[in-house]
Structures are given as structure tokens and as C-alpha cells.
């Protein structure tokens, strides 16, 4: 139900079980889980489907959309100042994944700390016109060509950073520590 977002559903349990079986690589369990996954995909009771525009999938208005099987909920209204870990109500990973020194002329993205840069190998694995590439990765040269700035003075600089979980204007807390309280949900399992 819409008022119970964040609760594990039967669909989420089936999808997680499928992940476990795949990692176990146990042929004796594959047929059973394949049957359950087929039901998950074809039974309209589950109501999962792809959204038409992949580019908006990681925007906050598409959290828990029909493509989402399971997400970890986060909120920007937590009054957390706890650096100890995942006890925060907000998503502290977001600030770490954002590009350092980023200034966006469109005021969509805000500066992060530049951790976990995207590798060139991952960037190059996408076909040039694949919409998943634009949604997943910020190419710093392309970003600069569009009038933005990004610092290259960071450890392990690659020229690429994560877009789908990049800090965005208006997504962080005005209550607790801003860096610890981004509202971006983590999409654990998508359809």
C-alpha cells in the first residue's frame, strides 16, 4: 500500500531470493526461482513495470514508482548529526559521491566531496547514445562544455562522477547536518 513504502513486499522477497540463488550458482534452485520470477514479471497483481523515461528514474518524484521493487527510504527532515553510519534518517552517501568543485549553471546539481569516481572503463562500457549512460554518469568534459565547472584536483580523478546519486539542489536538510541528510532513496531492486 502507498502508506507503507519501505516495507518489504512479497515481490521484494522473491527478487532478493533470486539474487541469492544467482550468487550461490546452485542449478538445483534455478528452476524454482525462474518460475517465481516469471510470476513476478507476468502477474498483474505485482504491478511492476518499466517507466517510459529512464532519465528521470532517480529523481525524487519517481521514488517507489512502478519500476521500484525495493528501496531504502531516506528523508531530508532528520535532525541527525551522527557520523557513525546508517543510523541517520538522511542519505549521507550522496555528498560523498558528488563531484568536488562542481558548479552547475542550471542549478540542478550541487558540489559533493568527490569520493568513488566512475572509472573510464565503466563509462566506455556504455554505447554513446544509451540513455542509461547519461542517467548514471556525469562526464566532466561534457559538463564543462555546457558551462559547468568541476574540480580535477581530487584523489583518483577520472573525469567522471556518479549522476544518479549526485547531490541535487533542494534535496538536503535544513534541519540537521546538511551533508548527512539527503533525501535520495537507494534503489535496491528495480524491475
Give the location of each predicted region.
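Substrate-binding cleft of carbohydrate-active enzyme catalytic domains
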Residues: 1, 17, 21, 191
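Flexible glycine/proline-enriched surface loops and loop-helix/loop-strand junctions
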Residues: 2-3, 118, 174-178
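Residues that mark the junctions of alpha-helical repeat units in TPR/alpha-solenoid scaffolds
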Residues: 3, 10, 184-188
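An aromatic- and glycine-enriched ligand-binding surface/loop that stacks and positions planar moieties
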Residues: 7-156
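C-terminal substrate/ligand-recognition segments
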Residues: 131-191
Amino acid at each position: 500500500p502507498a502508506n507503507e513504502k519501505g516495507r518489504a513486499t512479497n515481490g521484494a522477497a522473491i527478487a532478493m531470493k533470486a539474487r541469492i540463488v544467482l550468487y550461490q550458482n546452485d542449478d538445483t534452485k534455478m528452476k524454482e526461482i525462474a518460475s517465481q520470477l516469471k510470476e513476478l514479471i507476468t502477474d498483474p497483481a505485482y504491478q511492476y513495470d518499466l517507466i517510459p523515461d529512464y532519465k528521470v528514474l532517480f529523481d525524487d518524484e519517481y521514488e517507489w514508482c512502478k519500476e521500484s521493487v525495493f528501496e531504502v527510504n531516506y528523508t531530508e527532515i532528520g535532525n541527525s548529526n551522527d557520523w557513525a553510519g546508517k543510523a541517520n534518517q538522511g542519505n549521507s552517501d550522496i555528498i560523498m559521491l558528488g563531484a568536488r568543485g562542481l558548479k552547475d549553471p542550471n542549478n540542478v546539481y550541487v558540489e559533493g566531496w568527490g569520493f568513488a569516481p566512475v572509472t573510464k572503463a565503466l563509462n566506455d562500457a556504455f554505447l554513446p547514445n544509451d540513455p542509461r549512460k547519461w542517467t548514471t554518469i556525469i562526464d566532466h568534459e561534457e559538463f564543462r562544455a555546457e558551462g559547468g565547472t568541476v574540480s580535477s584536483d581530487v584523489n583518483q580523478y577520472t573525469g567522471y562522477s556518479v549522476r544518479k546519486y549526485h547531490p541535487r539542489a533542494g534535496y538536503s536538510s535544513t534541519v540537521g547536518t546538511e551533508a548527512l541528510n539527503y533525501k535520495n532513496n537507494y534503489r535496491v531492486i528495480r524491475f
